[in-house]
Amino acid sequence: MGLQEDFEEYAEKVKTLPESTSNEDKLILYGLYKQATVGDVNTSRPGIFAQRDRAKWDAWKAVEGKSKEEAMSDYITKVKQLQEEAAALKAVFRAYLVGEMNIFECHIGRLTRCRRGFRTQMKKQIVYSPGTREMNLLSLIKPSLAHVGYCSTYG
């Protein structure tokens, strides 16, 4: 694939970056994208009351003078870097949940593997890991439905 095709592919991949991506990184990507697609800044700086537009304009202005090819290459590199950081953070978070907090995976609609410990472990999971997407689902499960699920520990 050529640089243009790679750039278009990574312009789509950027949409899958986590919401926790910093505004600074988003602005860097914005500036590189604009430089790669439009070229040098061709508008005047937005007024002081348009802070968001002003920050975006400043990010674009910061990469002024780069060739379109260089901006595309830098954009691809930055997206790869952010994807790697997100994957590493996810792995660390998962290892923490599994190792430190003894979190287990719970699937609804299958036969029980650990009938005796299910309710106790499920309660521990809800207490230890509030706020995760999985817990939002598990918090809706009534203890009387424990027999339709199974639990298994990671590791």
UniProtKB/Swiss-Prot annotation:
One of its GO terms (biological process) is fatty acid metabolic process. Signal peptide: none annotated. Gene3D superfamilies: 1.20.80.10. GO terms for cellular component: cytosol. Disulfide bonds: none annotated. Its main location: cytoplasm. Residues 3-88 form the ACB domain. One of its GO terms (molecular function) is fatty-acyl-CoA binding. The keyword Cytoplasm applies. The keyword Transferase does not apply. Highly expressed in leaves. Expressed at low levels in roots and seeds. It holds the Pfam family ACBP. Induction: Down-regulated by cold stress, wounding and infection with the rice blast fungus Magnaporthe oryzae. It comes from the Eukaryota. Keywords: Cytoplasm, Lipid-binding. It is found in: Cytoplasm, Cytosol. Belongs to the ACBP family. This is Acyl-CoA-binding domain-containing protein 3. It comes from Oryza sativa subsp. japonica (Rice).
